[in-house]
Amino acid sequence: RRQRQMCIRDRFPGTYFHIGGDECPKSSWKNCPACQARIKAEGLKTDKNHTAEERLQSYVIQRMEKMLAKHGKKIIGWDEILEGGLSPEATVMSWRGEAGGIASALQDHDAIMTPGGNGMYLDTFQGDSKIEPVSIGGYTLLEKVYSYNPVPDTLVTLGKDKHIKGVQANHWSEYMYNTDIMEYRMYPRMLAVSEIAWTPLDKKDYKDFERRINNAYVRLDGHDVNYHIPQPEQPNGSCNFVAFVDSTSLTFKTTRPETMVYTLDGTDPTPLSTQYTEPIKVTETTTLKIRTVLPSGKMSPVRNITVEKQALAPAKVVEKTTPGLKMKMADGTFFKASELNKATEWKEMTVKSLRDIRSQVESTESMRGVKQYGAIATGYVDIPEDGVYYFTTNNDEVWIDGKLLISNEGEVKRFSRNDKSVALAKGLHELKVVFLGHIIGGWPSLWDDASISIRKADQEKFTPIKPEQLFY
């Protein structure tokens, strides 16, 4: 043990040592004989403030604090270390909002603010999830980061603000598969974190910061640093395949005021292409290419949008239907729909809803403890009225009237970036759904719910297809 302690001292020469302490599943400690034996041996009791299990965590942390103190170190821990009572010299890192930092300061302990909900998590989206690289979720624009004040007014009023030692932005990397994506999420938001840490509150000015960002971009370019450039986004969710019947107008915006340029002749836009100033009206099938251009001339990725004129696909005439969908399943791990052609053993059944396509059968032989499988569900979906409908799903494939509408093949099955729209007449339309159980990019597709959501072109929000819309 002494050897390990010496190793810690030598490898981490700084004063502070972060011990973690977050997300410990204390509920499982209730059924752990070793944990309960330690609770009994140490005389840890449940009281009105803490459970015995929370006291156990505090006991462990205090032991660690004493061990590290022998080597001249102080501990930092996530705000869960408050739950069993704070160790004497502990500094709290407040990530679940500001409450942990405030509670720590009120006990005259130091704290570092890093609340995810206040913009201090940089692994979140900073644009429309439909066109941005996959992320854990959340939505944090540059202005939200810059606007955060890490010193709560409550502590200023009580004279406890001296205990807020600083601010930190976390950059969790489970959806950052290369350095480009890591930098893309980090910048320019990390520049805003720097300013809120160093700039007096009365000197903060977001409009001025927004102007100075353009100068910072040039400096980042000089160091070959990748950074986020706001892309042209459509209201109600961006989509790269827009169907229409007679004519349509495409409206775009950016999350920060930047110039947008576009073409309708199939060429990629340049800084000198037509500037977007008003909705673009389209009456014939065309390819719209649009991107953002910075004052330096650097441009965002091109958005290639197919705008297709369609007649309403006619509804199917079916004499007799039964609620639900037909489905067949094959055990195994499949990464492409075409791999299902090799399956030899199928189980056939019917399901009442799209969510029923996803099942979890326990298996000790599979990652995540559930059996992997592929499934194909077929039947009809009832469309309530004539119109253009946008579809979104995390399933591998969705077919409408015998045509492939959405394919998410090979992608992380989160926040689908392959939405499409289609013109449909009122009534029944053939539906086929392909669901593959697998893990891509660290995300198990079995964590999804197999739903499909739709919205009419003139509606703002998607709604899941309901069981009463499904027939076979």
Write out the residue ranges for each language-model feature.
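Short secondary-structure boundary/capping segments
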Residues: P33-E42, V92, G127-K130, T344, ...
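Short, compositionally stereotyped local motifs that mark structural "simplifiers"
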Residues: K204, E210-D382, V388, T392-N394, ...
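Short, internal active-site loops enriched in acidic
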Residues: D22-K26, I81-E83
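Substrate-binding groove of N-acetylhexosamine-processing glycoside hydrolases
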Residues: F12-Y16, K40-M260, A377
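Short, small-residue-biased leader/transition segments that mark boundaries at the very start
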Residues: Q3-I8
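Aromatic- and acidic-residue-enriched carbohydrate-binding clefts of CAZyme catalytic domains
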Residues: R1-R2, S27-A52
